[in-house]
Amino acid sequence: MTEMTETKKVEVPEGFMTGKFPLKKRAYGEEQPGIKVGPFKIRLPLIHHEWSWTEMAAAMFLGVACLGAGVTTTMTTFGLDDPANIAALGFDENGVFLMALTFGVLNAICYYLPSLLGDPVVPGWITPALPLTLKFLQQWDLPNYATGQVDRIYAMIALQMLVALSFLIMGATGIGRKLVDAVPMGIKAGIVLGAGVTAAVNVFSARMPKAPWTVAIAVLMSYFFLFNPTFARKATKSRFWNVVRNQGVVPAQLFAIILAPVLLHEIPLPQIQWGFTPLSFGYVLEHFTIFGLGFPAWSFFLAAIPSALATYIIAFSDFVLAKEVVAEATAYRPDEKVIFDASRSNLVSFLRNAIMSLFAPWVPMCGPLWASG
């Protein structure tokens, strides 16, 4: 007797990987091509993955929203909204805003590192740790640039360096991956559910009182564009509505930014100025980094150890959430194998925090996942 081995034939959809880009094609159901460099897989636009205009547009709007919040946090934490400090630095209000904007732009550039290095997540801040960071920094007075008293900046540099070191240790040793794999399913479910609850609480407690109608309508619009089955079916039949659906929460964001001030008058109408914005990397290096201020004293590092450990513990839940989200999404994507490696993700977070601690200490710090609002 002859035994016949039946091979399961995979049906490849028509038009799969037939375009000019990316130059390096992937086989159906396989991992995206990349250049293996240690734990990383370098993927370059147009070579290893195609360019998506819809995702670029969504990223621009979402990035600008966080840019504004990050710039405000930087200015208030480092005393850049104080007239005396503005005068001591030799700027006007617009000048210090551009200096603070430089922090946000460098952080936004670092958002590209996960995609570049093969980490299949959209990065963000360590948002739940922000109140702890601000409380830690309150031990030191606001910087006084006229006298050179900048202990708070030294403390922020030390804290972010220790957070970066935590990510490095957990990623390089593999402990981070083992911990993520060891988390029981019940706790994973709690983390996934908790991320959504945290985002909702943040929106309704912090932002609802300021603009209740705007927030309520924007939330309903987001749910409609993301989860409504009727709209999803309509998007499959219309190229225009498919593009709109692929923008995620951007339509709701545009409503809040543009239409809400006109129709509801709950928030001021934004003033848009077109043109190139000059940044102040030189001034940031001189006044906020080890290259201009010198290395922080060891006392700052000792004081920052508890806050750094607490920050990593908070960020750890994002690794668990990222793994579960990627696993769930992959089940609906038979065309591609997506691999989330917690060790690699830890190392990418190390690089982002290390870069920011050296060149523009970032108060919200750099987390592995964009998980809360």
Where are these regions (language model features)?
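Helical membrane-embedded segments and adjacent short helical loop/helix-boundary regions
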Residues: 54-71, 94-95, 118-124, 154-155, ...
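N-terminal signal-anchor module of multipass membrane proteins
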Residues: 2-149
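Membrane-embedded helical hairpins/re-entrant loop segments and their flanking transmembrane helices
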Residues: 41-60, 76-112, 309-373
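Membrane-embedded alpha-helical modules
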Residues: 150-266
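Hydrophobic alpha-helical transmembrane segments
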Residues: 155-160, 206-210, 290-309
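Hydrophobic alpha-helical segments of integral membrane proteins
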Residues: 175-183, 200-207, 275-280, 284-287, ...
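Flexible hinge motifs at transmembrane-helix junctions and intramembrane kinks/re-entrant loops
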Residues: 3-8, 19-25, 212, 224-288, ...
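Transmembrane alpha-helical segments of multi-pass membrane transport proteins and ion-pumping complexes
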Residues: 63-83, 104-116, 159-173, 189-199, ...
